[in-house]
Each structure stands twice: as C-alpha cells, then as structure tokens.
Amino acid sequence: MRVVMCILIISFTVIFGMSCERHMEQQVSYTEADSLNHLAYDMRYKDLSVAMKAAKRACQLAEGNSDLRAEALNNMGFCAFMRMDFEKASSLYLQALKEGGNEIEHLISDVGMMKICQRTSMNKEFYDYRNSALQRLKRIREDEALISDTHEKQRLNYAVSEFHIVSGIYFYYLEQHDESLRSINSITPDVLQGDTAQWLYYEYMRGSGGMYEAPTREEITIGE
C-alpha cells in the first residue's frame, strides 16, 4: 500500500511540475506576443515588412489568448490594407472579429472594414460596419471608467481617432462637408496624446482632405 501511495505522490508531483512548466512557457509566449504587438503598431508607418513580421509572430505566440490574437490580426490587417491588398486585409479583420469578446479590438476591426469599404466603394457595407462600430463604442463608453490598463486606453484612443478620421474622409468625398467637419472635429487633442504617428496621420488627413475649419479662406489655406 505504501509503495502504491509513493508512486501516486511521485506521479502527481511530476504531472503538477509539468503543468506549471507549460503554464510558465505559455506566459512567456504571451509576454513576447504583447511586445511584438507593440512593435507592429509602432512600425506601421515606418516599415511595413517589420510590422507585418512582428504581427504574424505575435499571432502565433498568442495561441489560446484571444485578446492578443485579435490585436495581432488587426495589426496584420492594417499592413495588408496599406499594401492595398484589400482582400487579405478584409480576411484578417473578419478573423479578428471572431476572436473572443474584446470590444476595443473588435471596434478596430469594424473601423478597418470601414476603410476597406470606403476604398472599394461598398457604400451599404460601409454603413453596416459604421453602425456596428457606433454600437460597440456606446457599450465601451458605458464601462470606460473600468478601463485601467494603459495599453487598452491607447488602443481605444486609436480606435476612436481612426473611426472619426475614416468617417470624415467618407463624408468629405460624398460632399457632405458639415458632417465631415463634425466627424473630424470630434477628435480631441488628449485622444492622440502620446501617439505621434497617429497625430501626424490625423493632421495630414485633416489638411490634405480639406477638413480644416477657420474664419477666413486665407487661414484655411495656411492651416491646410
């Protein structure tokens, strides 16, 4: 009986140790995936190849973590969009929408699909994804006070700024100038604080897209 008990104890100890080791390895992978997601985002306007490579690796390492995978897929979708591979970008954003229940990442996916629909003249689908994004944003705002993670806040600010920029551009090309200005002016400076690349993108689109407002024509020209 004692021999059996000893065998059981040893077996349990070995199994428990292996389980702990696997858990630790998984956590190391998730930490690396998180760092790679940050790198992919930071490099998105500097080097698309580096950004895509980092996002792909993050997606692999994030197996079992839907939040990290959704973020990686969104980063990959952005890179594909920038390369004008709209079919690939669409596939990645739609895949991200199926990952878990992270409303912030799903909001980013919706906005990514809005950009694709705008570029491919899919007007009905644009409004479908825009309405979905508005509903998500409403739900997020209801619980926004509970968001304490700095990275989550940054992702939300990115999503919100992208939503208003994309909407502003869309309405501008439809010659709905009041709606376009209303959308672009919804972006407040604090939303882009700490995200230089996104702030520059916002300023560029605002100026080049004719979404700058000022009292006189001369001031508008200077501002743009």
Which residue stretches match the model-derived regions?
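Bacterial N-terminal signal peptides
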Residues: 6-15
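N-terminal leader/linker segments that initiate helical-solenoid repeat arrays
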Residues: 20-71, 87, 102-103
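Residue register of alpha-helical TPR repeats
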Residues: 27, 34-35, 71, 108-110, ...
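Structural motif corresponding to the intra-repeat A-B loop/turn of tetratricopeptide repeats
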Residues: 45-46, 76, 83, 120, ...
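Amphipathic alpha-helical segments of tetratricopeptide repeats
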Residues: 56-60, 94-98, 131-149, 181-192, ...
